[in-house]
Amino acid sequence: MKYYAMILFMFAVASCQTSTVVKKLKGCDSLVITFNHPGTDSVLQSVSTTETKAIQKIAGFLDGKAVTPGSCDFNGNMLFFKAGRQVLPVVFKYSSDNCHEFVFDLDNKVMSTKMDNEAADFLKSLSGGKNWY
């Protein structure tokens, strides 16, 4: 019985831990999202916010399953800031159905995480001019 209690405790602790990327972005006070012209690095549009709730929601999107980076074009990037200093730049892909991902450098390691449909829909709405969170 002790053995099962210990395993249950370990799972409970593990499930309560915050991911490394969410920890890194904790306390960020501004975010800039840029959208590129298709197939280029030229900025088509940018959106920024200082709303804590919005920043936390978007930061949570980055906490997806680790994936191998795809070979499609990037659609834009996100820049998270804290007290005027850049904390984490993130590039993203969402326009192709088989290529939804975020790519960022976390503690000198390039990470690529799967973008869920909610995140893709959110970015599509922002690029279309809708500013809702």
Question: Whereabouts are the PLM-identified features?
Answer:
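Function-determining sites in protein domains
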Residues: 16-133
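Sec-dependent N-terminal signal peptides
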Residues: 4-12
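Positively charged n-region of N-terminal signal peptides that target proteins for export
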Residues: 1-4, 17
